[in-house]
Curated annotation (Swiss-Prot):
NAD(+) binds at residues 48-52, 200-205, 224, 229, 270, 293-295, 318-320, 370. PANTHER family: ALCOHOL DEHYDROGENASE, ALL-TRANS-RETINOL DEHYDROGENASE [NAD(+)] ADH1B. It catalyses: a primary alcohol + NAD(+) = an aldehyde + NADH + H(+); a secondary alcohol + NAD(+) = a ketone + NADH + H(+); butan-1-ol + NAD(+) = butanal + NADH + H(+); 1-propanol + NAD(+) = propanal + NADH + H(+). The keyword Lipoprotein does not apply. Dimer of identical or heterodimer of closely related subunits alpha, beta, or gamma that are encoded by genes ADH1A, ADH1B, and ADH1C, respectively. InterPro entries: ADH-like_C, ADH-like_N, ADH_Zn_CS, GroES-like_sf, NAD(P)-bd_dom_sf, PKS_ER. It holds the Pfam family ADH_N. This is Alcohol dehydrogenase 1A. It is found in: Cytoplasm. The gene is ADH1A.
Length: 375
């Protein structure tokens, strides 16, 4: 029986308050309006950005359905939708690509002005929600909200992918893999023979290691306080792994001594102000490029000496690995299908959706790289 045009009742993980577990609730998902798409979720990854909301370091309106790294199948479309149709395999896009704003029209930029990152509204682009629970509207997260059996997104925030692609793997291309990999190959533009340092060896950090290797870096130094992640980092391309807790001097000084004055490229993939500064300081003062990849704590500032940049360093940041989401995500899936890279090493756990809180416990304890939830 077709559900198109009807309200769908399903299960979703609702975050009612920060610092509290998710609650599996019965929610109502309204039909898509014009230029919107309703998706039946199949797989979803647990990303550190979701946990930033739970911990309160990333502020978004509550109550909310989180989740933004996923794959699913189009259930129905609203009036005017032309780029996907019911039955298509898709990846929801936490960073939209409207194709019309000044950023979308700039070839090397991807931070579409329709995003819900800078000043989160917690709604779709028309300013309203499609979720209801206990008679109350529930907020969206980054315009996608994939911790739900069904979700509604704007057409500019969904990409059709290869019908043969395994959704339990390519869902990672919806955030973690593309963010890390792109930070190396597209944002920093790592050069062959260069030296790189990657701070943080979660799913995104390890994807950055993969990007550095793909770009031809000669040395890739992985930095983390969890030594259990070193074997995986070396498997994916790290040439050396170091733990800051093993040294009495600041880690940036250790890295500078190891690399004749500093690395060519550094990546902060944690989201801490102290490691952002260490990442900047460890790159060479005359030619180093440092990329902020981790989401920083809300409303906190860094103070730096401008001389650190005057000598020739470049300090930059990017969302989504610099990729233009709607056009580049299908290309990355095609590359995966062509075996240009593997995602297997990033997936350490697979759990049923109902065990979402267990999945977040694995993340917080450092026992997982990526946990995939299946519906």
């Amino acid at each position: 029986m077709s559900t198109a045009g009807k309200v769908i009742k399903c299960k979703a993980a609702v975050l009612w308050e920060v610092m509290k577990p998710f609650s599996i609730e019965d929610v109502e998902v309204a039909p898509p309006k014009a230029y919107e798409v309703r998706i039946k979720m199949v797989t979803v990854g647990i990303c550190g950005t979701d946990d930033h909301v739970v911990s309160g370091t990333m502020v978004t309106p509550l109550p909310v359905i989180l989740g933004h790294e996923a794959a699913g199948i189009v259930e129905s479309v609203g009036e005017g939708v032309t780029t996907v149709e019911p039955g298509d395999k898709v990846i929801p896009l936490a960073l939209p690509q409207c194709g019309k704003c000044r950023i979308c029209k700039t070839p090397e930029r991807n931070y579409c002005l329709k995003n819900d990152v800078s000043n989160p509204r917690g709604t779709l682009q028309d300013g309203t929600s499609r979720f209801t629970c206990r008679g109350k509207p529930i907020h969206h997260f980054l315009g996608v909200s994939t911790f739900s059996q069904y979700t509604v997104v704007d057409e500019n925030a969904v990409a059709k992918i290869d019908a043969a692609s395994p959704m339990e793997k390519v869902c990672l291309i919806g955030c973690g893999f593309s963010t890390g990999y792109g930070s190396a190959v597209k944002v920093a533009k790592v050069t062959p023979g260069s030296t790189c340092a990657v701070f943080g060896l979660g799913g995104v950090g390890l994807s950055a290691v993969m990007g550095c290797k793909a770009a031809g870096a000669a040395r890739i130094i992985a930095v983390d306080i969890n030594k259990d992640k070193f074997a995986k980092a070396k498997e994916l391309g790290a040439t050396e792994c170091i733990n800051p807790q093993d040294y009495k001097k600041p880690i940036q000084e250790v890295l500078k001594e190891m690399t004749d004055g500093g690395v060519d490229f550094s990546f902060e993939v944690i989201g801490r102000l102290d490691t952002m500064m260490a990442s900047l300081l460890c790159c060479h003062e005359a030619c180093g490029t440092s990329v902020i990849v981790g989401v920083p704590p809300d409303s906190q500032n860094l103070s730096i000496n401008p001389m650190l940049l005057l000598t020739g360093r470049t300090w930059k940041g990017a969302v989504y690995g610099g990729f233009k989401s709607k056009e580049d995500i299908p290309k990355l899936v095609a590359d995966f299908m062509a075996k240009k890279f593997s995602l297997d090493a990033l997936i350490t756990h697979v759990l049923p959706f109902e065990k979402i809180n267990e999945g977040f416990d694995l993340l917080r304890s450092g026992k997982s790289i990526r946990t995939i939830l299946t519906f």
